[in-house]
Amino acid sequence: EIASCLVGSEMCIRDRYILCLAILCVAIAAPTFAGEYQTGGDSILRTTKYGRKQLAITKILAAFTLFVVTFLVGITVHILILDAAFGTDCLKTSFQMRYSIINLPNINLGQLQIILAAAGLLSVLATVSCTLFLSAKFKDTLTVLLISIVVLFMPLFAYVAMGATWLSTILPSAGIGMQNNFLSQLANFNYLNIGGMSFWTPHVILISAGIELFVFTFLAIHSYCRHQVA
């Protein structure tokens, strides 16, 4: 009963918390480059010795540092508060006992907390990297923010409409949401097929987010360096 309460209530609250944190990070990241394009400050910074690639890398590293620290502090406080409220006696309970003995992950609820936090951080950073790329590509902060919000919620809408598909799992924010969150994917047997191979959706989500984190970061730097001042 305690385990059911923990997973059913605490994990649900954590999913919503990570989603809200992702929205906040996207809103903060949107004007990173686009804000300077709008004010014209970009044209001044580009004339300095380190005004292109080095500046882009510094801005991105500063943004990632801010978001990682914010996420880790927030999720740690969040876990401590919820564990204090629901109790820690059930953290050694098997994840398989809560859902089904045939669930693939052979972990306990304490390990599940760490896995969900790590997956949430990776998804948030991948989503932020996409926002940074859009910010380096477009000159209007509002446009960047609107597109980023659409990208953030697209996996949720895709999952509700079509279930577990490639569209609902390969986007940066695939592990963030309600029905499509990483916890629900761990608890289910959703597989995606390509050719003669099958891939478990949690693996697809993590691998895609990891690849997109590096790809979008590189594209953000490249786009900023190639941006032409009007």
Q: Model segments located where?
A:
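Single conserved hydrophobic/aromatic residue that forms the stacking wall/gate
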Residues: 1-8
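A structural motif at transmembrane helix-loop-helix junctions in multipass membrane proteins
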Residues: 113-152
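Alpha-helical transmembrane segments of multi-pass membrane proteins
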Residues: 53-74, 78, 115, 119
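Hydrophobic/aromatic residues in alpha-helical transmembrane segments
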Residues: 25-29, 41, 130, 220
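Terminal transmembrane helical anchor/hairpin motif
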Residues: 87-111, 142-145, 151-227
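Long, hydrophobic alpha-helical segments
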Residues: 15-35
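Helix-loop-helix units of permease transmembrane domains in multi-pass membrane transporters
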Residues: 32-66
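Active-site loops and adjacent core secondary-structure elements that bind or stabilize anionic groups
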Residues: 11-12
